[in-house]
Amino acid sequence: VFHGGVAGLKQQVEATVNLLTTDGRTPQKQLDDIRLHLHPQLKKQNTEFQEVLQPLLRQQGICILDYIELNQQQRNYLDNYFQEQIFPVLTPLAVDPSHPFPHISNLSLNLAVVVKNPDTEEEFFARVKVPQVLPRFLPLPPELRTEDNGKTANWSGIPLEQAIAHNLESLFPGMSIQEYHPFRITRDADLELEEDEAEDLLLAIEQELRKRGMGGTPVRLEIRSQTPESIRSRLLQDLGLTENDIYEVDGLLGLRDLMYFLLLPLPDLKDPPRQSVVPSRLQRLKEPCINPDVPEPEDGKDFFSVIREKDLLVHHPYQSFSGTVVRFITSAAHDPNVLAMKMTLYRTSGDSPIVNALIAAAENGKQVSVLVELKARFDEENNIYWA
């Protein structure tokens, strides 16, 4: 919502646009209502994680620790890991009159650091970006994992930013680390397009995508509630934000990174994968079937005979997409009686069987026309490639 909706509302407020919504709210009123409802939701979200989800994870042997909870052996291991794997990819940037505030990329995790020169007592502000090329959570080896009731944990480790924070002396040799505070910003990701004026829409979108890659206007600052006023005001000033744009998060920033734990080989903690079914009317067709679970008898009907007899309504994801829609497109691509294929693509994956079938249809001499929606939000680059 912040990438697009909130960013758009902020632009309307700055442009003094006071158009009312159907329920009579101005852009400013909508922003106020978003903040009013979102702050308690964020607080509840972090409370649920810390007081409910984390204890449940611990019961299952998944221990997300704080650095201060580690014993000396565990600290030594992670400190060595920092020196060998993390330190080489870090680039701390000081901010002073000769070094302007660095560009903060969208949704990147950062540390605001205050260091002091022990000789001059002068303090400096610096920013350390938590590298996105490394896992957000650093695991301990099995022999160092936390034990509970004599059982070794399935996973033990700490967030990456804590390993960095407790080794800041390596990044600022000769300086005294005064304080550090994590923060994250969200930038406007909407494309500013004047479609009526654009001679080439595809080229215009490509240009806007390059701008978005450099980063749109900041619209939100996420910090901890303990972040002091001096750091808050510094970040707000350099990012061009106001107090209303601050969202306090007491806990992990960027909870979506917890998806990391879904990759752990613990099948008992996961729902069994849902097996989509193929409608019975499509289970005995002549054409080769993409779904290997469907038999391919030679005496079956072809796809078009089935739908010619009666319309077929399918429900996804309960019924197989590959065994219905993909099979339909693939059948058409290879059917000599099909002369032309026309369809619209809004979002599709990089290895889409739909696209492969359309390419095969064109190679088979059929007339293929595809309308690709270039403005599918956050899929623009992918759709430009297919277009």
UniProtKB/Swiss-Prot annotation:
PTM entry text: An intermediate of this reaction is the autophosphorylated ppk in which a phosphate is covalently linked to a histidine residue through a N-P bond.
Any one Gene Ontology BP term: polyphosphate biosynthetic process
Species of origin: Aphanizomenon baltica
Highest taxon, organism lineage: Bacteria
Protein name, as recorded: Polyphosphate kinase
Entry EC no(s): 2.7.4.1
InterPro entries (UniProt xref): PP_kinase, PP_kinase_C_1, PP_kinase_middle, PP_kinase_middle_dom_sf, PPK_N_dom, PPK_N_dom_sf
Listed GO MF terms: ATP binding; metal ion binding; polyphosphate kinase activity
Cofactor (UniProt): Mg(2+)
Record carries keyword Kinase: yes
Gene Ontology CC, one term: polyphosphate kinase complex
Keywords: ATP-binding, Kinase, Magnesium, Metal-binding, Nucleotide-binding, Phosphoprotein, Transferase
Coiled coil region boundaries: none
Taxonomic classification: Bacteria, Bacillati, Cyanobacteriota, Cyanophyceae, Nostocales
Function: Catalyzes the reversible transfer of the terminal phosphate of ATP to form a long-chain polyphosphate (polyP).
